Swiss-Prot record:
Naturally occurring in which organism (per UniProt): Trimeresurus stejnegeri
Class of this enzyme: hydrolase
Protein residues bound to Ca(2+): Y43, G45, G47, D64
EC number(s) recorded for this UniProt protein: 3.1.1.4
CDD domains cross-referenced by the UniProt entry: PLA2c (cd00125)
Protein name: Acidic phospholipase A2 Ts-A3
Keyword Secreted part of the UniProt annotation: yes
Gene Ontology cellular component terms for the protein in this record: extracellular region
Primary localization class, coarse: secreted
Reported function: Snake venom phospholipase A2 (PLA2) that shows a moderate inhibition of ADP-induced human platelet aggregation when tested on platelet rich plasma. Exhibits high hydrolytic activities and prefers the anionic micelles (dPPC with deoxycholate) to the zwitterionic micelles (dPPC with Triton X-100). PLA2 catalyzes the calcium-dependent hydrolysis of the 2-acyl groups in 3-sn-phosphoglycerides.
Pfam families hit by this protein: Phospholip_A2_1 (PF00068)
Expression across tissues: Expressed by the venom gland.
Annotated active site: H63, D105
Length: 138
């Protein structure tokens, strides 16, 4: 447990927008991104290749593609601004790149929420990468 706490504290200082992404997932999908989506299917987690395995994995595929289209900042590191208005997440700020990252994260969180019924932990958690070989373009 202590190791997990230390890792979480280290991540807070290192991965700005990834922590925000976790927060958005918690707010919108009511699940922990770290414990639910960090090693799921072919695309949820670090990297990604192959065919998305279900609608949840496709959320991660689309999120990866969205990050790939962002230019001018680092989607995983740079902090963005957002607010909540009438239960909706509203991305803000003057930096178009950071706003785009926020929109990517918001869309993924909504996708996770809308596809909770496809989430199959037993089948796709720590899915073997050998089953993720076919390349799929964004």
């Amino acid at each position: 447990m202590r190791t997990l706490w230390i890792m979480a504290v280290l991540l807070l200082g290192v991965e700005g927008s990834l922590i925000q992404f976790e927060t958005l997932i918690m707010k919108v999908a009511k699940k922990s991104g770290m414990f639910s989506y960090s090693a799921y299917g072919c695309y949820c987690g670090w990297g990604g290749q192959g065919q998305p395995q279900d609608a949840t994995d496709r959320c991660c595929f689309v999120h990866d593609c969205c990050y790939g289209k962002v230019t001018g900042c680092d989607p995983k590191m740079d902090i963005y601004t957002y607010s909540e208005e009438n239960g909706d997440i509203v991305c803000g700020g003057d930096d178009p790149c950071r706003k785009a990252v926020c929109e990517c994260d918001k869309a993924a969180a909504i996708c996770f929420r809308d596809n909770k019924d496809t989430y199959d932990w037993k089948k796709y958690w720590r899915f073997p990468t050998k089953n993720c070989q076919e390349s799929v373009p964004c």
